[in-house]
Curated annotation (Swiss-Prot):
Disulfide bonds: none annotated. This is Ribosome-recycling factor. Keywords: Cytoplasm, Protein biosynthesis. The lineage of its organism: Bacteria, Pseudomonadati, Campylobacterota, Epsilonproteobacteria, Campylobacterales. GO terms for biological process: cytoplasmic translational termination. Belongs to the RRF family. InterPro entries: Ribosome_recyc_fac, Ribosome_recyc_fac_dom, RRF_sf. Responsible for the release of ribosomes from messenger RNA at the termination of protein biosynthesis. May increase the efficiency of translation by recycling ribosomes from one round of translation to another. Pfam families: RRF (PF01765). It is found in: Cytoplasm. The keyword Cytoplasm applies. It comes from Campylobacter jejuni (strain RM1221). Its main location: cytoplasm. The keyword Protein biosynthesis applies. One of its GO terms (molecular function) is ribosomal large subunit binding.
Amino acid sequence: MLNEIFNKQKTQSEKSLEALKKDFTTLRTGKVNTHILDHITVDYYGTQTPLNQVATVLASDASTISITPWEKPLLKTIESAIAAANIGVNPNNDGESVKLFFPPMTREQREENVKQAKAMGEKAKVSIRNIRKDANDAVKKLEKDKAISEDEAKKAYDEVQKLTDTYTTKIDESVKNKESELLKV
């Protein structure tokens, strides 16, 4: 019974950590990352489709992303979807592909991204605390139903807190690593 609670807490905490790392890919660092376009969808025959499912998205160099659609008529649609996404660059349509030229990041942009990374980290910590609350509630229910003793419940609460502390530390480390990556010129 308790192992199920711990395993569930661990699985959910791991998912929160992975979600944080995925969120971090949307932050721009010193070099371009094609994941900055992951949230962009284009109208493909009446259906909103992720950009990477209708085109090849490549980082040509440290400051350029090239998007080559699999069907030429999509060029204009892709161009307008990127412009509407407001990612800080203007798309350039050369007739074959759409190119995005990212200027070097300013100190202010880097610091703004650090703030966003910290906010993402806080959101992940809130998620971890909510997972802890659910686990503690499950332990409390077992104790109330007399399925476990008071001593077992105390040990279970300690284990839940230990798992929470472990994942909170992992989140802090991830934020710190992302911060140093963002501030590196």
